[in-house]
Amino acid sequence: MIDRRTLIRGGTATGLALLASPAPAAGPSVVRIWRACVDTPKTRLAMQELRSGLVALGLARDVREAPDGAGAPTFILSIVAGLASETYEIARSGDTVTVRAASEQALLHAVFDLLERQGALFGLDGTMVPPGGVRRWSLPEAGRPWRAEPAFATRGLLPWPDFLNCISVFNQEDFRAYFAAMLRMRLNLFGMHVYTDTLQPTEAYLSVRFAGAGQQAELETTATRGWGYLPQRTSTYGMGSSELFDRETFGSDAARLAADNWEIADRTAAMLRDGLSFAGDLGIRTGIGFEPYKLPAAIGDALPPEARSHPAGFADSVTAKRLLEARLADLLERYPMVDHVWLWEDETSNWDSRAKDVPISTTAFVQAHDFLRRHAPRKRLVVAGWGGFTRHFARLHQNLPGDIIFSALGDTLGWDPVAEAFGGLEGRERWPIPWLEDDPSMWFPQFRASRIEDDMRRARSLGCQGMLGIHWRHRIVDPTATYFAGAGWDRTLSARTHYARYARSQAAPSRAPALAGLMLDCDTGGAIASTYTGATTPDGHAGHVELSADYQEAFKYRENTPDPAMLLRQRRTAARFEALARLADTALERERLGYLAGFVKFLVPYCDAYRNAHALDAVLVRADALRKAGDAQGARRLVGEEGLPLWLELLPQVRAAIVDFQSVIATRHDLGQLASMQNKLVRIAVERLRLSLEEFLGDLPEEALRAQQAALVPASGAPRLFLPTRPSILRPGETLRLFVVAPGVGADARIGLLHRGLGHTDWSRTAARHEGRAVHSVALGPVEPALGVIEYRVEAEGRTGTISDPPAGGAYHAALLA
């Protein structure tokens, strides 16, 4: 082993870029890269990304920085004048491939494009290469270079905060991993909406002081009440889920480690400020904003009644105008690096305006534009809203300055087409926001590439210059998110072609076509549960059903029940996914196919439990009517004969849903979803429905209590080890904490981070620190700049053997930028 100190003392490093790979495969002995451009952090990053990518793909074993070499493939990276912004071309002559780019950013884009054409996949959850590597180059023909320019000048993401499986639970390392992923996906804009409502927790990213009062500052944790969540200790989770959490509260350290409300706000702002600054270093523009016509509860309580009684409305009062300036000034003070300030129409107004067309006030938008002109003229204002906001576009277009950008979420959770109103904004920049996933199906896998394909084609036809994708989760959204990123450059990319490409990154060549077909069936064939029903409502919107709406209680069995025909298709689809996963012949392929199969598999018992809970609720409604009519005995008999058997049937279904999902989770977002499912599915189905039964039956029979206990018993399974977050860029001299989740490995297991320079033989090992239950942590960095590229993995050595992440001798490649 090499002493770990040989990997530290790296104070001059400016970045570390991550690439996951299987065990090394054979390739050419030497490949050369030469930078025919100015030596900068970004051009060095481009070279190291190309170096690590080619090795990870199995196309090279040794990549050297040299201008040429007889018989060795050579890549020349250059920046040239005369190309439009972000454009590049890749040409080949003999053994030499020349990359010519318009800028440093375009050079990075070109390298990522080149690697993707070889088989790499850049997604929200990081980078994947085909399980067995690749054996053939994919290069342009001599004299016929590849040329690329973006289909949209603005290509971004809008990660939505508010749940346990999203940006709300981020720590520093999560923001680092996220922005590095955006860079590799060739995206260039990050947007963020902040709820400042009285009905839900007021998010801590913004925290204004006004009229002598401050505001509540929260990030969603398992100790939070709101969005259908109730406070719950993670130690109370059944089925063994508690072992996957290090302490009683799961969430961002900014919230769970803070002493009080003010420290939550300060920690949150510091964390996001660090993340946004880092995004800027990578060339990603950023923006954040709020709903000007919605006030935090405490701020609203502090306002004078005379402001609310203003004849023209509160927005035109002196108090409202001073408050808006205070909110804008607070935003700019907290995040001076942002490029855009967003003002949002609130969600309630959007849905209310469907029934009654109420014009939106322009007062706040005009005032904010003037404020930015005076105090931050380089920052641009974006006005946005939910899908119904486009109903205001024509009037707003006439009344607002032309440099304000218009944006809106797709209507009906993105299942309606991009609004025609975007086409009536001649001369104005506009960005539709398609839904990469929707929250009424928040726990489900969602394959939406075909929907995004339609949205992007229509947005281009309406003259839109940009698009941002709204999402919450990462890895399970990548089948759609990677399409969105790719189609932002390739106008011809179809969902069908994309799924085939995505499948090749997950499965061996013999199984990739079957996987692609399954994903396409889920997308276009109604093969699994979906929010979209395929129907159109009388008012012309897409019909939708909510079976796991995480913005409320999710397990909302009272409102609806799954379609029986869909349940049959879903059962068959889950069996096909599972059968395909069983055919995997390497540990890496088993993990990737098993992840997708597990997500689809848990839908079956979940929907069965949902259906039984719906039937049980109907029994309880009838029993309640009997009780109100004075027939308590009849109510008791009905619940005992019809209700209790349904509960006994759904208990093992709830258990199966949790155990199936729990067995494949691999990311921090998955951990958050597991916490949500414990809080909403398990708590409601196992605890609340039991109390509902006891209202009529009193003490339940022993068999029912035994069934309840059996449903909650910790599940046994094979030992697992995974890194929920894999940050991919380090700043000079810093260290990032990585959590390691290791259920079933045993208390005496030896867990550590292994790391070495790429091409080196010996590994250095850093021991993990136990954080609580089955959760440990390791430190990544600082890294010695002279190594150029390192690779690392986490391992657990126990009585049952050694397991690792990545599995079977694989590694995460990390290219150092010095």
Predicted regions and their residues:
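Secretory targeting signals
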Residues: 1-2
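N-terminal export signals
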Residues: 6-25
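Contiguous, structured surface segment used for ligand recognition
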Residues: 26-150
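Structured segments of extracytoplasmic/periplasmic soluble domains
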Residues: 53-60, 113-117, 181, 185, ...
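Carbohydrate-recognition beta-sandwich/jelly-roll modules
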Residues: 100-126, 173-190, 197, 469, ...
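Substrate-binding groove of N-acetylhexosamine-processing glycoside hydrolases
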Residues: 143, 333, 345, 349-708
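Aromatic-lined carbohydrate-binding surfaces of glycoside hydrolases
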Residues: 151-416, 470-480, 486, 492, ...
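Glycan-association/targeting regions that enable binding to alpha-glucans and other polysaccharides
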Residues: 685-818
